[in-house]
Amino acid sequence: MGIKNSIPRLDAVDKVTGAAKYTEDLIPINALVGKTLHSTIANGTVRAIDVDEAWKIPGVVDILTCFDVPDWEYATCGHPLSLDPAHTDVANKRILTKRVRYYGDEIAAVVAESDLAAQKALEAIRVEDEELPPLLTPEAAVISGIPLHEKSPDNQGGRMDFIIDESQNVRFYQGTFSMDPCIGGYVDLRGTKFHVPAQQHCHIENICCFAYMSGRKIVVVSPNQA
């Protein structure tokens, strides 16, 4: 393989003709269905969840709320775990959370015998929230004095400082930014605003996963970014 050579992708024909098997094609017919209840507020705390009516839906197998799961935290990026704290993702997310930080945060889950039963159960759940003002811009997050996460009181969960040199090349900057407009000939970008469109991988596979027991282990089958 080299420059100017056209190399066919091994799975291209199978993907465009529908012959390729995706994760959703591999789910067993008798598998239970899990669905997640998402928050309808952007910032606040879940005070109570009433699941009594949801349990009355035929086919419901189990219901879990943010009050039923451990307070274990994990990172959401899916990168390999590093034992070096400087090179690992921030673990600040619970599988179901009482502290809502964005519209759509996961607060409860339903397991049922069918997709329809799971959806009806979600619609029957009643949630009592204590809503807080949403912080919708970086400026609001910085000056509000309201921490979005207890581990990041300044609302900076992560930070990458970079500069643009005289040749318009972007470089990461490891030092401390000063109030001067330039640092050694580099432009200080703190006062500059950038607007970018929404990003999407444009994958052709639905977002889903399934799991099954193998002895005492749980095997999870999920898509990746390949």
Question: Where are the regions a protein language model picked out?
Answer:
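Generic structural signal for well-ordered, non-membrane alpha-helical segments
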Residues: R9, R47, K93, V111, ...
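Conserved beta-alpha junction segments in alpha/beta enzyme cores
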Residues: G175-A226
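Conserved NAD(P)+-binding/catalytic subdomain of aldehyde/semialdehyde dehydrogenases
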Residues: V170
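Flexible, low-hydrophobicity surface segments
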Residues: M1-F162
